[in-house]
Amino acid sequence: MAKLTKQAFVEALKEMSLLEIKELVDGLKEEFGIDPSAVAVAAGPAAAAEVEEKTEFNVVLKSFGDKKIEVIKVTREVTGLGLVEAKKLVETADAVIKENAKKDEAEALKAKFEAAGAVVEIV
């Protein structure tokens, strides 16, 4: 028996009807013992994990830039901290300003801090 090339196989498939292709697939499943439910179960959770979207974010102050006083004012306004606590927080490297914020709240905080001259990251 001559070896069938991939290209010849594809050309042969192009000439088949959908019913013939279905019968071919069913025959291959039977010949090689392929269980379609096992394939679907294995692929199911991975597909669900890809769709899952993060809903809570942390707003992290990376740098106060050259407007430290403005950033301290915004920090006090957002967190409700006193002057000394807000100053310490601003001076801390990678300080978390807000934890578990919703996406739109985190974006609003980022915009507010950036307007004051800070470098902020949402993680």
UniProtKB/Swiss-Prot annotation:
The keyword Ribosomal protein applies. The keyword Chaperone does not apply. Keywords: Ribonucleoprotein, Ribosomal protein. GO terms for molecular function: mRNA binding; structural constituent of ribosome. One of its GO terms (biological process) is translation. It holds the Pfam family Ribosomal_L12_N. GO terms for cellular component: cytosolic large ribosomal subunit. Forms part of the ribosomal stalk which helps the ribosome interact with GTP-bound translation factors. Is thus essential for accurate translation. PANTHER family: 39S RIBOSOMAL PROTEIN L12, LARGE RIBOSOMAL SUBUNIT PROTEIN BL12M. HAMAP family: Ribosomal_bL12. Belongs to the bacterial ribosomal protein bL12 family. Homodimer. Part of the ribosomal stalk of the 50S ribosomal subunit. Forms a multimeric L10(L12)X complex, where L10 forms an elongated spine to which 2 to 4 L12 dimers bind in a sequential fashion. Binds GTP-bound translation factors. This is Large ribosomal subunit protein bL12. The lineage of its organism: Bacteria, Bacillati, Mycoplasmatota, Mollicutes, Acholeplasmatales. The gene is rplL.
